[in-house]
């Protein structure tokens, strides 16, 4: 069974960074031009996001030769909404893949030059875009966990884990966005095993799907790793790592 490890931070290898055009069948692999890639997910974020820094030399492969070409922003073109299939591997062999791809949210900070262009690409999940176009309108009756499951289904979202709730809560959508509604419901939810004073729920997305989790149930789980935060940078023997230690990096092997 794979386990978590601590390892010195080091560059990873982007083995695939394929962007597909929205206006043709053309697709380009920019893995050789991506100089920085940052991926974000958080229990406080409704959607996964990522940012890439791309250096475009203005040349592309043509069989065994290289020829001049328009920049990728204009040749593909990249305007927003393009699906991007990404695969990253670190120095420990951990592989990060996005089975449903990520989608270009915006192109920013383009810096054209005489020999190369540099620009940033911001990415989000497909459900992020669907959330912007969908509204919750109808009346809901029953348990909150069932409401959340139905609402996320309207944007074709899939759940990684959904904790059941107790008690019934009835409401009308009032033309709100799905993510907003689910976050609002999370603050009112009570886990099914207890109807007393509880901490509520968290609604967030990982690359494996959406999660609607009871905060109490999360804290009842056995810890995977123990970390300490102090100004000395030293790690006592009873903990796994110091948050401030130089080069500390937490990896999940899969």
Report each predicted region and the residues it spans.
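Active-site palm subdomain of RNA-directed nucleic acid polymerases
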Residues: 159
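Extracytoplasmic/secreted envelope proteins and their assembly/folding machinery
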Residues: 145-149, 182
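Second-shell loop/turn segments in exported
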Residues: 132-141, 167-173
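Assembly/oligomerization scaffold segments
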Residues: 1-133
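Structured segments of extracytoplasmic/periplasmic soluble domains
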Residues: 150, 154, 188-191
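Subunit-assembly interface segments of extracellular/virion macromolecular structures
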Residues: 130-132, 138-139, 151, 185
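Short beta-strand-centered interaction patches in the first periplasmic/extracellular domains
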Residues: 118-121, 125-127, 162-253
């Amino acid at each position: 069974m794979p386990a978590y490890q601590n390892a010195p931070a080091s560059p990873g290898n982007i083995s695939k960074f394929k962007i597909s055009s929205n206006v043709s069948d053309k697709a380009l692999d920019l893995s050789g031009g991506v100089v920085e890639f940052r991926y974000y997910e958080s229990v406080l974020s409704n959607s996964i996001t990522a940012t890439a820094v791309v250096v475009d030399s203005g040349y592309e492969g043509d069989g065994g030769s290289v020829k001049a070409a328009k920049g990728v922003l204009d040749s593909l073109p990249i305007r927003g909404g393009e699906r991007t299939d990404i695969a990253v591997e670190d120095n420990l062999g951990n592989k990060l893949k996005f089975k449903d791809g990520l989608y270009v949210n915006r192109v920013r900070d383009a810096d054209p030059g005489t020999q190369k262009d540099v620009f940033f690409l911001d990415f989000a999940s497909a459900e992020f875009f669907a959330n912007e176009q969908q509204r919750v309108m109808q009346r809901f009756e029953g348990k909150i966990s069932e409401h959340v499951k139905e609402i996320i289904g309207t944007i074709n979202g899939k759940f990684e884990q959904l904790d059941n709730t107790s008690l019934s809560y009835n409401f009308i959508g009032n033309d709100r966005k799905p993510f907003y509604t689910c976050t609002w419901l999370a603050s009112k939810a009570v886990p099914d095993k207890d109807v007393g004073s509880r901490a509520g729920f968290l609604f967030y997305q990982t690359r494996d799907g959406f999660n609607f989790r009871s905060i109490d149930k999360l804290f009842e789980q056995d810890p995977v790793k123990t970390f300490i935060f102090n100004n000395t940078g030293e790690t006592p023997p009873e903990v796994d790592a110091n948050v401030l230690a130089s080069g500390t990096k937490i990896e999940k092997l899969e």
